[in-house]
């Protein structure tokens, strides 16, 4: 369950103030609904069928993007190197209405299946089966029927999807729930709509995955250390790759070359992400300073939009690039982002996935 009251994250989500306190009664009601849904699930009132293979859920408790998709890509590639046969499911955010699960390929339409699934297919060269549908359990059924060799499923988001049956590792199972957390943290720690949280910050998880540095507030107050004391957490290093031209992927330049070639005032960075500032900050760390145009997540692009941007060089994300296949503008350069999984994380992940199926030993 989520709210779409705000096109982009309001500032009062970051710190408690008059507006967030005024909206707090609605957040309390939202929390009550969450607890009721959890109770129904825990009591087994709604029957769900266990999945025959382990499930890795890469989700977040804060609305908006926190960097889940690069993690899904990195997980699939690393697990494949280790001998696993991953499959991927996604809701397909930003997609048009669907009546049945759909198989995603690198040439699928983002408007039909969503931005992230197409990006995953492109970055993995269609190596893994990817299925999208809001009802994730049906996606799993379609995936396993189409690709019975799959022995582990990665879900891009889905923490709040109660219909996605799981037996988490922390309870002795072999399914894994990851909460991805970026530099914004939990903001004012209120639930929607007074704050940015889909679920309480204290939500159980098997591990927290950090994709950014702690916010200034957390460094100053020490809340971060107190909250994560005794919890399993991993810091995942992210880095920007070598940009390539949108109309000619073989034409590449380093960010340093681009920064030397164009003056800052003649360059513009554009990002339609849940947290576009992260892209801009990553560029700045590489010495690229330019004008910034932040857009809402899943923003749509047209030739007319880019024509209005007066710049000699336009830098966009790979997620945005999948929606620009029909655009021919030599000024546009795509900046890929990759992610490194530390070995201690991979070893822990392996130890969980290799557990025996707990469903076989229950009466």
UniProtKB/Swiss-Prot annotation:
Species name: Polynucleobacter asymbioticus (strain DSM 18221 / CIP 109841 / QLW-P1DMWA-1) (Polynucleobacter necessarius subsp. asymbioticus)
Listed Pfam families: LpxK (PF02606)
Keyword Membrane listed: no
GO BP, sorted A to Z: lipid A biosynthetic process; lipopolysaccharide core region biosynthetic process
EC nos: 2.7.1.130
Residues binding ATP, per UniProt: 62-69
Tagged with keyword ATP-binding: yes
Family the UniProt entry places it in: Belongs to the LpxK family.
Function description: Transfers the gamma-phosphate of ATP to the 4'-position of a tetraacyldisaccharide 1-phosphate intermediate (termed DS-1-P) to form tetraacyldisaccharide 1,4'-bis-phosphate (lipid IVA).
Enzyme type, top EC level: transferase
This protein's name: Tetraacyldisaccharide 4'-kinase
InterPro entries in the record: LpxK, P-loop_NTPase
Lineage: Bacteria, Pseudomonadati, Pseudomonadota, Betaproteobacteria, Burkholderiales
């Amino acid at each position: 369950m989520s709210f779409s009251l705000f096109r982009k994250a309001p500032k009062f989500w970051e710190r408690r103030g008059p507006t967030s306190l005024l909206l707090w009664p609605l957040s309390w009601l939202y929390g009550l609904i969450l607890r009721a849904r959890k109770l129904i699930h825990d009591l087994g009132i709604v029957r769900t069928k266990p999945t025959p293979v382990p499930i890795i859920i890469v989700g977040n408790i804060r609305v908006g993007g926190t960097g889940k998709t690069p993690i899904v890509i990195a997980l699939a590639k690393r697990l494949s190197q280790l001998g696993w046969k991953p499959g991927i499911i996604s809701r397909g955010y930003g997609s048009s209405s669907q009546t049945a699960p759909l198989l995603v390929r690198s040439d699928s339409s983002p408007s039909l299946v969503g931005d992230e699934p197409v990006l995953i297919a492109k970055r993995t060269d269609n190596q893994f089966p990817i299925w999208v549908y809001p009802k994730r359990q049906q996606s799993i059924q379609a995936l396993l029927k189409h690709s019975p060799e799959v022995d582990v499923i990665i879900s891009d988001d889905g923490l709040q999807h109660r219909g996605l049956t799981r037996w988490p590792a922390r309870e002795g199972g072999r399914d894994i729930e990851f909460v991805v957390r970026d530099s914004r943290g939990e903001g004012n720690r209120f639930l929607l709509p007074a704050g940015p949280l889909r679920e309480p910050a204290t939500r159980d998880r098997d591990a927290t995955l950090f994709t950014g540095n702690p916010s200034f507030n957390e460094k100053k107050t020490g809340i971060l250390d107190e909250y994560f004391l005794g919890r399993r957490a991993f810091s995942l290093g992210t880095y920007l790759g070598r940009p390539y031209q949108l109309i000619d992927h073989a034409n590449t330049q380093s960010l340093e070359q681009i920064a030397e070639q164009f003056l800052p005032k003649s360059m513009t960075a554009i990002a339609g992400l849940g947290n576009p500032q992260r892209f801009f900050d990553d560029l700045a760390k590489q010495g690229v300073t330019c004008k910034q145009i932040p857009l809402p997540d899943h923003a749509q692009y047209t030739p007319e939009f880019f024509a209005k941007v007066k710049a000699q060089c336009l830098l966009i994300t790979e997620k945005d690039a999948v929606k620009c296949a029909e655009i021919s503008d030599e000024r546009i350069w795509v900046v890929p982002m990759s992610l490194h999984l530390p070995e201690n994380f991979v070893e822990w992940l392996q130890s969980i996935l290799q557990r025996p199926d707990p469903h076989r030993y229950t009466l």
